Every structure is written in structure tokens, then in C-alpha cells.
Curated annotation (Swiss-Prot):
Organism: Thermoplasma acidophilum (strain ATCC 25905 / DSM 1728 / JCM 9062 / NBRC 15155 / AMRC-C165)
Catalytic activity: L-glutamyl-tRNA(Gln) + L-glutamine + ATP + H2O = L-glutaminyl-tRNA(Gln) + L-glutamate + ADP + phosphate + H(+)
EC number(s) from the headed UniProt entry: 6.3.5.-
Pfam family name, one: Asparaginase
InterPro entries, per database record: AsnA_fam, Asp/glu_Ase-like_sf, Asparaginase/glutaminase-like, Asparaginase/glutaminase_AS1, Asparaginase/glutaminase_AS2, Asparaginase_C, GatD, GatD_N_sf
Listed GO MF terms: asparaginase activity; ATP binding; glutaminyl-tRNA synthase (glutamine-hydrolyzing) activity
One annotated GO biological process: amino acid metabolic process
Biological role stated in the UniProt entry: Allows the formation of correctly charged Gln-tRNA(Gln) through the transamidation of misacylated Glu-tRNA(Gln) in organisms which lack glutaminyl-tRNA synthetase. The reaction takes place in the presence of glutamine and ATP through an activated gamma-phospho-Glu-tRNA(Gln). The GatDE system is specific for glutamate and does not act on aspartate.
Top EC class, one word: ligase
SUPFAM superfamilies for the chain: GatD N-terminal domain-like (SSF141300), Glutaminase/Asparaginase (SSF53774)
Active site: T78, T152, D153, K230
Assembly mode: Heterodimer of GatD and GatE.
Name assigned to this protein: Glutamyl-tRNA(Gln) amidotransferase subunit D
Higher taxonomy: Archaea, Methanobacteriati, Thermoplasmatota, Thermoplasmata, Thermoplasmatales
Keyword Ligase belongs to the record: yes
Length: 409
């Protein structure tokens, strides 16, 4: 880490150098903003190296006086972090009041924050999904609800994995993320977490995601994990419910919008996953050799095809050989909204003849996770039938118009 003081035109600016490449230099200024300059246009007044601060873990803490206990499992991510503008480090928030302050959460609930991981979500692997799931299962014996604080980038993967691994749930499980850290005035972390706690205090018997319903404050949606997807890089309402309305909304109280699975008297957690599954985005120019290399040694592959679920005809023989060897090829659509239909055009019919399984209107990432779950849990000869079975609400009978979904009607 380097701290610098530089002159740009008539201004003197100090801060931390966070990137320097391709003739550009990016500085995290003392006011917290990132500023990028053409290297040739700045003059360094001072530049010195400093030891990078350690990445700290959030501390375990329990607060509140409420009768119902909610366990918050911290895995990393923006939701429970703040930026130290003096050092440039991202540090965890260890005091729940920084997230829950200004609400009555701690008078109605007892909140126990427990760290189980401290990773950016893009670094999480299927083994980490199992670890998170086991922690949720352990907490289910004592808590009335479990909230998992998670980075948003891969939250849909992890939450969907838990949705499949939990055959029965004794308490609600709600994932929560944030697009902006808690130190920023525009942070969504506090509202998302407060809503998540309230969602976790219901009789929900499935895995949900708690995120802003719009760019404005005041409304937070609870999305069914297996119908959710991050659809924007930075907006506070980055997550969308694909093809169905949100499960519920929170605007000071919880209101369920559609039918949902209720909690059970017992917990059944089945953690075995087969991670030899791949996901491939078809694109013009993808050749047979590259496709063969991508799917080699994989037990299943989810292909994101064009439109109704197509790929170039010269790749179909590769897929046919792959399925003939006892593996599974699943066709999803790059369009996200709508459903695959391989019976409309000749290419689709050739893919069906090659042994391809349609994902229908499953979200592609969910199809990927479901394949891992089925291969890890059931005899492989059941895979085709089970994949087409609606197990956790991952398949919908019909897609609703986007306008209706946004309105939650």
C-alpha cells in the first residue's frame, strides 16, 4: 500500500494509491472518493509505502432484549463492513447497533452475531456453501431464525444451494447483502438487515434474500432464493425476482405477497454436492475443441444458449458424445426471462435428440446449483426426471410480466 500527496493542475490531493496501470493512477482520496488521473498530468509531492492493514474478522456479539433469538452468521461482504478512509481498509462492523441503531430491532429480538467466514463472495466455493449450511443447521436448534450476511455477487448461488440442501427447515433462513458499506450515507445495509431480521421472525420455511425493492429507502423485498438474480452491478435494488413476485415486502412490517412454504418441526440437511458441474455461455465462434476441453471430466454442464435455447449446429456432435458417455447436458437461456423450448426450431430438436435436458424457465445459476445437488444426492439414473421436477419453487408454471413482478401483484 502506498500513500501519496500529488499535485493535479492547481490542486494538491492526498490519499492511497489503489491502482496504477496503463498510464492511469487511481487514488482513494482522504474524503473517501476514488479519483483517476492520467499519470502524465500529475506531479508527486510525496510518495511512500505503508504496511497494509490486516483483514479483520467480525467479532461474535449478542445484543437485545427480545424474546425471539435471531442468529446472524457473517460470511464477509459489504453488508457488515465499513471503509476506513484514513487507511483505505475495509473493516467489519462489530457492533450490531451500527446496523440496527434507530430501530426497535434490539427491543423485539435478541440478535447473536457470529462469524463463520470472512471472504469476498467471489472466492466462495461449493465447500463453503456446505460450511454455511452446516452452521445454519447448527443454529436452527436454538435460534428462532437465521440471517446469513453475504456478499451480493454470488449470494444467489449460495442461497440456492442452501435451499436445495435443506429438505426441511425448522426456522426461516434469510440471506442479506448490501451494495454500499455501512459508513456511507447512501448505504442500504441497515434497512436490508433490519428487514432480514423481521423476515427471519416469521414462519417462512424456505430460503430468501432480503434486498432493497427500489433505489429509494422504505421498502425491502424478500425474494425466493431459487428465483433470484443480481441484475445490476451497483444499484441498491440490484436483485430481481425472475418470473414471480417477491415472497414478501417490509416497510416497517412484513407483508407476504404470495404463498410460501412454512417451517417444519424438524431440520433435514443433506449437504452432499457434486462440484464436477460446469456452466458455459455459448457465443458465436465457440469451437468444438474448446467446448470439449470445457466439459472434460465434468458430470454435467449447463449451457446458456441463445433465445429459446440454441447453440451452433457444429457443436451438437460434441454434446451428443458427452451425453452418450453418461453425462448430462442442460440447456438454459441467456435471456433470463422466458423459457427454453427446443421443439420450435430444427436446432432445438437436434439438441433434444443429442440428449440435452431443457432448463425451462429456471434461472441458469440455479440450474447449475440444482445439478450439483442432484448428482450429489441421488442415483444418476434419476437425474433427468428429478431435474425436471419442481423441488423448491425453482420452476414456475408461467412467467408474469415484468411490470406485475415489480409491483408485487
Amino acid at each position: 500500500m502506498e500513500r501519496a500527496v500529488l499535485r493535479y493542475k492547481n490542486s494538491v490531493i492526498s490519499g492511497l494509491i489503489i491502482n496504477e496501470s496503463n498510464g492511469l493512477i487511481t487514488l482513494k482520496a482522504s474524503n473517501g472518493y476514488n479519483m483517476t488521473f492520467d499519470r502524465s498530468e500529475v506531479e508527486f509531492i510525496e510518495r511512500k509505502k505503508e504496511e497494509s492493514p490486516e483483514r479483520k474478522s467480525i467479532e461474535a456479539v449478542e445484543k437485545g432484549q427480545g424474546d425471539r433469538k435471531i442468529s446472524v452468521l457473517a460470511t464477509g461482504g459489504t453488508i457488515a463492513s465499513r471503509v476506513d478512509y484514513e487507511t483505505g481498509a475495509v473493516s467489519p462492523v462489530s457492533d450490531p447497533e451500527l446496523i440496527f441503531g434507530g430501530s426497535d430491532i434490539l427491543t423485539r429480538f435478541t440478535v447473536a452475531v457470529k462469524p463463520i467466514l470472512n471472504e469476498f463472495s467471489e472466492n466462495l466455493k461449493p465447500a463453503d456453501w456446505i460450511r454455511i449450511g452446516q452452521a445454519v443447521a447448527d443454529e436452527s436448534s436454538e435460534a428462532d431464525g437465521v440471517v446469513v450476511a453475504h456478499g451480493t455477487d454470488t449470494m444467489a448461488y449460495t442461497s440456492s444451494a442452501l435451499a436445495f440442501m435443506f429438505e426441511r427447515m425448522r426456522v426461516p433462513v434469510v440471506f442479506v447483502g448490501a451494495q454500499r458499506s455501512s459508513d456511507r450515507p447512501s448505504s442500504d445495509s441497515r434497512e436490508n438487515m433490519q428487514a432480514a431480521i423481521n423476515f427471519a421472525g416469521t414462519d417462512l420455511g424456505e430460503v430468501g434474500i432480503s434486498m432493497h425493492a427500489s433505489t429509494s429507502d422504505g421498502h425491502v423485498s424478500l425474494l425466493r432464493s431459487v428465483r433470484s438474480r443480481k441484475m445490476h452491478t451497483s444499484r441498491r435494488d440490484a436483485f430481481e425476482s425472475i418470473g414471480i413476485p417477491p415472497l414478501a415486502e417490509y416497510d416497517g412490517s412484513v407483508k407476504f405477497l404470495i404463498d410460501y412454504r412454512r417451517v417444519s418441526d424438524t431440520v433435514e440437511f443433506r449437504p452432499d454436492l457434486d462440484d464436477r458441474v460446469s456452466m458455459i455461455y455459448f457465443h458465436p465462434g465457440l469451437n468444438a475443441g474448446d467446448l470439449e476441453n470445457m466439459i472434460a471430466e465434468k458430470h454435467a454442464v449447463v449451457i446458456l444458449g441463445t433465445g429459446l435455447g440454441h447453440m451452433a449446429k457444429d457443436l451438437i456432435p460434441v454434446v451428443k458424445k458427452y451425453t452418450a458417455d453418461g453425462n448430462y447436458a442442460i440447456m438454459a437461456s441467456q435471456c433470463i426471462y422466458g423459457s427454453t423450448d427446443l421443439n420450435v426450431y430444427s436446432t432445438g430438436r437436434e439438441l433434444l435428440a443429442a440428449g440435452v435436458i431443457e432448463a425451462g424457465n429456471m434461472v441458469p445459476e440455479v440450474a447449475y446449483v440444482k445439478a450439483m445437488y442432484l448428482l450429489g444426492q441421488y442415483p444418476h439414473d434419476l437425474f433427468r426426471d428429478l431435474f425436471r421436477k419442481n423441488m423448491r419453487g425453482e420452476i414456475v408454471e408461467r412467467d408474469l410480466p415484468v411490470e406485475i413482478i415489480k409491483l408485487g401483484r
